[in-house]
Amino acid sequence: MPAVVNIAAYKFVVLDNLPTLRADVLAQAGAVNLKGTVLLAEEGINLFLAGSRDKIDTFLQWLRADSRLADLEAKFSLSETVPFRRLRVKIKREIIRMDHPAIQPQSGRAPAVSPATLARWLEQGVDDQGRPVVMLDTRNAFEVDAGTFEGAVDWRIERFTQFPAAVQAHRDSLRGKTVVSFCTGGIRCEKAALYMAESGVEHVYQLDGGILKYFEETGGKGFNGNCFVFDERVALDPALAPAGAVAQLATA
C-alpha cells in the first residue's frame, strides 16, 4: 500500500501578521519533514503537502489549533513517492490570483452543491427546480485537457485572471440555467462563483471541495479522464491514484 499521504486544503479567512505565520508554518512543517507548498495571504491559506500519515496528522493538528483554521478541511490521496522536491511557504497578495479585489471570499461563501447532489443532478439532467445544469470548468485549458465533466463548458482560458473577461463574453449563454463552477480542489470555483453572482449570473453554485472531493465521494460519476494536479503525479484518476503517465500520453 502506498506510504505517502498527500493533502490539499484551503480556507478563505482573514489572516494577519503573515511574516510570523509564515515562519511558524515553515518551522512546523519542516520539523515533521513535509514537502510541498503553502500559500498565505490576507484572504486565507492554500496548501499542498505530502509526507507520512502520522506527520501529516501532527501538522494538521497544530494548524487547526489556530481558531481561524479550526475547521480547515483537507482532501487526502496516496502515492508511492513524495511528489514534491522541497517545502515552500510563500506570502502572496491572493491565495489564488484573480485580480478583482472586490471579490472577497473570506467575507462569505457562494452557495455550494455537494458531490452527491451534483451526481444526482447530472444523472437526471436538471437540478431540483427543473433547470438545466451547466458544468463550468474554471481551470486552465491544459488542465481541462487531462479530463473534465462530460459536456462541461470550457472557455480555454490560459490563466485564472482571464476568467472575469470570459464571464462577460459568455454571460448571456448562462441565463435560465443552473451554473456549477468546478476546479481541482475548490479554491478557484469558489472565487469564480462569487464573481459570476456579482456579475448578475443567477443560480450559481460552486462544487464543494472541487473535483478531488467529487472523486472521493462519488467515484467520478460523469467525469471523463483524470484530474490534473500541479505536482509530479501529473494527474489523479477517479480512484485518487496517480495517473501521470496516462495523462501525459492522453494530452501529448
From Swiss-Prot:
GO terms for molecular function: oxidoreductase activity, acting on paired donors, with incorporation or reduction of molecular oxygen. The active site is at C183 (cysteine persulfide intermediate). Disulfide bonds: none annotated. It holds the Pfam family UPF0176_N. SUPFAM superfamilies: Rhodanese/Cell cycle control phosphatase. Residues 129-223 form the Rhodanese domain. It catalyses: uridine(34) in tRNA + AH2 + O2 = 5-hydroxyuridine(34) in tRNA + A + H2O. Keywords: Oxidoreductase, tRNA processing. One of its GO terms (biological process) is tRNA modification. Its EC number is 1.14.-.-. Gene3D superfamilies: 3.30.70.100, Rhodanese-like domain. It is an enzyme of class 1 (oxidoreductase). Catalyzes oxygen-dependent 5-hydroxyuridine (ho5U) modification at position 34 in tRNAs. Belongs to the TrhO family. NCBIfam families: PRK05320.1. This is tRNA uridine(34) hydroxylase. It comes from Bordetella petrii (strain ATCC BAA-461 / DSM 12804 / CCUG 43448).
